[in-house]
């Protein structure tokens, strides 16, 4: 797993993380511009036992639907006692075309908040439609809070994420971001992950991260979907109905 980009406190490369998260976490290959996140699906078999460029847990959602929703319960506390890894909590999908999307949240140790992140294939330049000033820079979603996530694979040719929750100032509202011009067609499967990602595989042994999160009431196209456990790499993944808890500990 690679280390996705950073926003606000962690330097936001706007090259956000879809690929980063996905790249580092799921596969051994890094996406362009985003350290630590998986990029393509070529090394899926390897990822099933270990997440290259990081550690964590992953589940797949066997649905080809277009709209993903879930309530994410953020960790009350995050122990990230190293200088090389970044915690991520995210969802996303793999298209039949091979495009991998990583969409969710990245932890800022500097501000103790969770910030939005997106990457779809080679595209990682986000467009903010609403809420940028409330959930980026030195602001983000408050630890221990619940965030309502909605992902649209293709909305007028763009991939969009909406996150609704409470920031570190106590403001409750939403942020809407999208990657434009993705033109996603058929989906192969969806996914959810919690990872601690690094930029290089050689940094894996130095990771010291402990946190736990849940994706509750997971639906795709308004239908409940039961997660299928794929990877537990220094992580415990527990599924109950259309809910999953991922606890990372190293």
Swiss-Prot record:
One of its GO terms (cellular component) is extracellular region. It is found in: Secreted. Keywords: Secreted, Signal. Residues 1-47 form the signal peptide. It holds the Pfam family YrpD. To B.subtilis YrpD. This is Uncharacterized protein YncM. The lineage of its organism: Bacteria, Bacillati, Bacillota, Bacilli, Bacillales. The gene is yncM.
């Amino acid at each position: 797993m690679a280390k996705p980009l950073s926003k606000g406190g962690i330097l936001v490369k706007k090259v956000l993380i879809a690929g980063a998260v996905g790249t580092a976490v799921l596969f051994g290959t890094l996406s362009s511009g985003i350290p630590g996140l998986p990029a393509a699906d070529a090394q899926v078999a390897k990822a099933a036992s270990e997440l290259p460029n990081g550690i964590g847990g992953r589940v797949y959602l066997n649905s080809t639907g277009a709209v993903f929703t879930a309530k994410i319960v953020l960790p009350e506390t995050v122990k990230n006692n190293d200088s090389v890894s970044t915690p991520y909590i995210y969802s996303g999908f793999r298209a039949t075309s091979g495009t991998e999307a990583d969409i969710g949240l990245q932890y800022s140790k500097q501000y103790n908040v969770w910030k939005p992140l997106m990457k779809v294939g080679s595209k990682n330049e986000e467009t903010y439609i609403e809420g940028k000033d409330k959930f980026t820079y030195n602001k983000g979603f408050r630890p221990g809070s619940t965030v309502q996530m909605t992902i649209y694979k293709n909305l007028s040719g763009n991939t969009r994420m909406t996150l609704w929750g409470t920031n570190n100032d106590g403001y409750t509202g939403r942020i809407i971001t999208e990657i434009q011009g993705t033109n996603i067609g058929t989906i192969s499967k969806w996914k959810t992950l919690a990872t601690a990602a690094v930029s290089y595989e050689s940094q894996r042994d130095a990771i010291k991260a402990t946190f736990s999160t849940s994706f509750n009431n997971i639906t795709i196209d308004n239908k409940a979907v039961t997660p299928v456990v794929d990877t537990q790499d220094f992580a415990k993944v527990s599924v109950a109905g259309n809910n999953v808890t991922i606890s990372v500990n190293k």
